[in-house]
Amino acid sequence: MSQANAAAKNASSDVFFNASLEDIDSEIFGAIRNELGRQRHEIELIASENIVSRAVLEAQGSILTNKYAEGYPGKRYYGGCQYVDVVEELAIERAKKLFGCEFANVQPNSGSQMNQAVFLALLQPGDTFMGLDLNSGGHLTHGSPVNMSGKWFNVVSYGVRKDDHLLDMDEVARLARENKPKLILAGGTAYSRVWDWKRFREIADEVGAYLMVDMAHIAGLVAGGVHPSPVPHAHVCTTTTHKSLRGPRGGMILTNDADIAKKINSAVFPGLQGGPLMHVIAGKAVAFAEALKPEFKLYAKNVVDNARALAEELKSNGLDIVSGGTDNHLMLVDLRPKNATGKRAEAALGRANITCNKNGIPFDPEKPFVTSGVRLGTPAGTTRGFGVTEFKEIGSLIAEVLDGLKVANSDEGNAAVEQAVKEKVMALTDRFPMYGYQG
């Protein structure tokens, strides 16, 4: 090879290994930079979102993304896995310690895939299972007819009572006795009250069903000791690793049953997934280590305290909260007292730099893409450092936008009110910088 060719080769290699994202792909760099600006200057109230630590970001963006590792620690189908084995073993042991369980599978890539893995392990196509109705706060993977869970299985949905919007446990028991499901799924994405895991297990045992708990939304609160744990009661628990747990986006499956654990492991790999995302598993391990620290318990307590403060402030400003309040990190806000829809409210609040999502309320007369409510959550704001005082202010700002929207009575909203609130929001977020950023 000539000296010129060798120099060119070395230069190319130097660029590949050392050039920055900004140098290589300015378009993607720009989109990421703009998203960072959005996160810094907006109040994040989407209940399923949170903010990870710099340590989690560093782990997830590491060279572990290069490594294929099909199988499980000590039983891989590829060589060179001795260090990623350490990573996954740490994630497993930390998860077990965090939730007090005997077995943990940390490989699921998402919440949907973790639930699919349990179905694959414990059910056959056509089997009957019960889950919370989507309109009562359930999830697509809990039996929605548009989801695989609703297409492959016979789904019997339970819901909340019409008068108080609390889980109707009498209905759960009646439906279980009538339909003899093979599995009962408890947990949801928009239910703001404490779940009675013990009662669910009693019903499951009575009809000979597995009890599966999807605690994706409340896992951080369970880990922090401010919500009862389902682990002692359920045959199997699933959870995402983001949301209130404050880790990278992904899933996890927990159980105390060795036979179920074996079935779960086979269902995840090779049944559902191939090579696990080792860089994400590293991020999970870091997040679990953070959640095992004493300060995480204070974080979880603050999440709930902040949610209650926000709910009470909204009520004092004339809004209704589904079920009357919250015991966890989220609430459903009934917008009908302000003559607003979820679609309009989400857009108006977004223009004021307050991010949330439209959400159906129980027995909602509006269409799913319109809705009568919005779902609000406090995990991200609490991570940022907001306390009760700030969430009361946020509640007042939300009411201000909705009152302006009511006066405008149009999709365009009230520009003057929204701009005034936006300025207040930016003043608030500037006091609570993210990732070392000031101003």
Curated annotation (Swiss-Prot):
Give the reaction(s) catalysed.
(6R)-5,10-methylene-5,6,7,8-tetrahydrofolate + glycine + H2O = (6S)-5,6,7,8-tetrahydrofolate + L-serine
- Site positions for Plays an important role in substrate specificity: H242
Lineage, top-rank taxon, reads Bacteria
Q: Which residues are modified to N6-(pyridoxal phosphate)lysine?
A: K243
> CDD domains given for it?
SHMT
Q: Which cofactor does it need?
A: pyridoxal 5'-phosphate
- Sites binding (6S)-5,6,7,8-tetrahydrofolate sit at L134, G138, H139, L140
What do the Gene Ontology cellular component annotations say? cytosol
| Enzyme Commission (EC) number | 2.1.2.1
Coiled-coil portions: none
Give one Pfam family, short name only.
SHMT
GO molecular-function term, one example from the UniProt record: glycine hydroxymethyltransferase activity
From the UniProt record, give the pathway where this protein acts: One-carbon metabolism; tetrahydrofolate interconversion; Amino-acid biosynthesis; glycine biosynthesis; glycine from L-serine: step 1/1
The UniProt keyword set, sorted, is:
Amino-acid biosynthesis, Cytoplasm, One-carbon metabolism, Pyridoxal phosphate, Transferase
Location in or out of the cell: Cytoplasm
Q: Provide the GO biological process annotations.
A: glycine biosynthetic process from serine; tetrahydrofolate interconversion
Family named by the database record = Belongs to the SHMT family.
Q: Which HAMAP family match?
A: SHMT
Its biological purpose is as follows:
Catalyzes the reversible interconversion of serine and glycine with tetrahydrofolate (THF) serving as the one-carbon carrier. This reaction serves as the major source of one-carbon groups required for the biosynthesis of purines, thymidylate, methionine, and other important biomolecules. Also exhibits THF-independent aldolase activity toward beta-hydroxyamino acids, producing glycine and aldehydes, via a retro-aldol mechanism.
Assembly notes: Homodimer.
List the protein's name: Serine hydroxymethyltransferase
Organism ancestry: Bacteria, Pseudomonadati, Pseudomonadota, Alphaproteobacteria, Hyphomicrobiales
Whichever gene encodes this chain, its name is glyA
